[in-house]
Amino acid sequence: HGAEVTVFPHGDLAALQAMLVEASGQRCLVVTDGVFSMDGTLAPLPELTELCRRFGAALMVDDAHGLGTVGATGRGIVEHFGMQQDPPDVLVVTGSKALGAEGGAVLASESVIAMLRQRARPYVYSTAPSPAVCAALTAALDILNGPNSPVPDLHRNVDRMATRLGLDTWPTPIVPVAVGDEASAVQAAHELGEQGWFVPAMRWPTVPRSRAIL
C-alpha cells in the first residue's frame, strides 16, 4: 500500500499538529523545505522538530536553497538554528544551487541510507555523477569551508540590498519584492532586464494568482 499524502498549510504548525493527532499510532513523515524558494523564508525547524519528536514522526528537510547560503558558514538551516546536535531525520541537499554543479546528497541514519540504496528508484536507476562533477563539488565545498569563504560577503550584500530596497533584513539571499499584478511584474522585469539586471517575474502558477513577485 502506498503512503497517504496530506498537505498542511504553509507555516501552519497548529494544522500540522492536528494532522499528527489524527494520525496517532501511524507511521508519519513530515516533509518541508528548509528555505522556501519563492519568498526566502525559513521553515521553523526547532518547532517542527519538537512536534515530530512529541508525536513520534520522522522529519525530512529539503535544504536545497540553504546549503551554501544560510548559517554563519553556509551549512544551511541546521546551522542557522544551531541544531547540529539534533538535526532532521533526513536532510536533503543539492549541488546544483549555491555549489554550482550537479547532483545531491541525502544525510540520514545508516538504516535509512541502506534502504534508499536498495529501494529508491531515482538512486538505483540513475547514473553516478561524473568525476568532473565530483571534483567540482569537492572544490566548491573546500571553498565554502576555507578561509576565503564567500558566505560572509553574501550575507553583507543581502543585508545591503534589503536595506536599500526598504525591506527588513532578510535571512536568505532570496529577497522577494511584492508586486501583485502579473502584468506589472512582467513589465518591471523587462525594464530591469534592459538595464542589465536579471530579475525574473514570478507569477501564477508558481505563486498564487494576483500575488506576483520579483
Sequence positions of predicted segments:
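Short, small-residue-enriched loops and turns at beta-alpha junctions
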Residues: 13-14, 35-39, 66-69, 123-124, ...
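Active-site C-terminal subdomain of aminotransferase-like
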Residues: 21, 55-58, 65, 70-171
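Pyridoxal 5′-phosphate
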Residues: 1, 9, 13, 31-34, ...
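Active-site phosphate-binding strand-loop segment of PLP-dependent enzymes
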Residues: 5-61
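Conserved PLP-binding catalytic core of the aspartate aminotransferase-like
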Residues: 152-196, 205-206, 210-214
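A short linear hydrophobic-aromatic micro-motif
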Residues: 92, 124, 198-204
